[in-house]
A protein has these predicted regions:
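Short loop/turn segments at secondary-structure transitions that flank enzyme active sites
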Residues: 54, 59, 159-161, 222
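A short, flexible helix-boundary coil/loop motif
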Residues: 193, 224-239
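Short linear functional motifs in flexible/disordered or boundary regions
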Residues: 21, 108, 114, 132, ...
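Helix-centered, glycine/charged polyanion-binding patches within enzymatic domains
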Residues: 125, 129-130, 135-212
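A short, amphipathic alpha-helical segment
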Residues: 214-221, 225-228
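Generic secondary-structure signature for well-ordered alpha-helical cores
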Residues: 34, 38, 192-195, 222-225
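Polybasic low-complexity intrinsically disordered regions
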Residues: 2-148, 214-217
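A general lysine-centric signal
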Residues: 87, 93, 191, 206, ...
Length: 239
């Protein structure tokens, strides 16, 4: 059929923002993919990760219309890169939980200054067989929660200046990193394919919905690719 006009799509997006519907839609898309045995929920793992995205309105002062140039609901994300250099980004953080095939199961968006570990409980499913995460989520609270859920702890360990990681934990972290790499692929899709390395809107609610729509598009595209490559799985062997 005909592609709707941009104004129609904009009004639809605004309705999603107003009624906070993107998460329900993502859940429904995943339910339908699960019903077709494209997403497999039994025995699934959960890979949680986060990425900073720059606020499109990150300058100081006011524009010609008198409105602030800076998105006040964004925040500074500061992280040390692999070379030990601190990198600062004024914007938001997109937090996702994906399965081993790269389908997004949970997602949320926060101001950039919110620590990644704060959203751990938002991303936990409760029925995952294992949780993969980086050292930002390494804590006794995380380990205790995973034990209550009966979930295997695949969270990387932290090293400290006066207590560096043992050789065993370094090897463990390296093994976890191989699986965790799958959790970063949606971010590459968002930034390179969907042009979302920077936000397009002012405010948390609008950006939450924008990245929620991106998550839905990501899962639909991946589901279509699975169908093209493999066809519909035999339900007798899919579970």
């Amino acid at each position: 059929g005909d592609v709707p006009e941009a104004s129609t799509l904009g009004r639809f997006r605004n309705q999603l923002v107003e009624h906070d519907l993107w998460e329900r839609l993502l859940g429904e898309i995943n339910r339908q993919l699960d019903a077709k045995n494209i997403i497999l929920t039994e025995g699934r793992i959960n890979i949680i990760d986060a990425t900073p995205v720059e606020a499109a309105q990150s300058g100081s002062g006011k524009g010609k219309d008198g409105q602030p140039k800076r998105d006040k609901q964004a925040g500074w994300h500061v992280k040390e890169d692999s070379r030990g250099t601190l990198k600062s980004t004024y914007g938001y953080s997109v937090h996702t939980g994906v399965d081993e095939d790269g389908f997004i199961q949970r997602q949320t968006v926060t101001a950039g200054n919110v620590h990644d570990s704060v959203e751990r409980d938002t991303l936990l499913l409760g029925d995952e067989t294992a949780l993969y995460a980086d050292a930002a989520d390494s804590s006794k609270a995380t380990r205790d929660k995973l034990e209550r859920f009966g979930t295997a702890d695949q969270v990387q360990r932290k090293g400290y200046r006066n207590k560096p990681l043992s050789a065993k934990n370094r090897r463990r972290n390296d093994a976890i990193a191989v699986i965790r790499a799958g959790g970063e692929r949606p971010f590459a899709t968002y930034k390179s394919r969907y042009g979302l390395a920077r936000t397009r809107f002012m405010g948390l609610a609008k950006n939450m919905t924008a990245y929620g729509i991106a998550a839905i598009a990501h899962n639909l595209r991946k589901g279509a690719k699975f169908l093209t490559l493999y066809g519909l799985p035999d339900p007798n062997y899919a579970r």
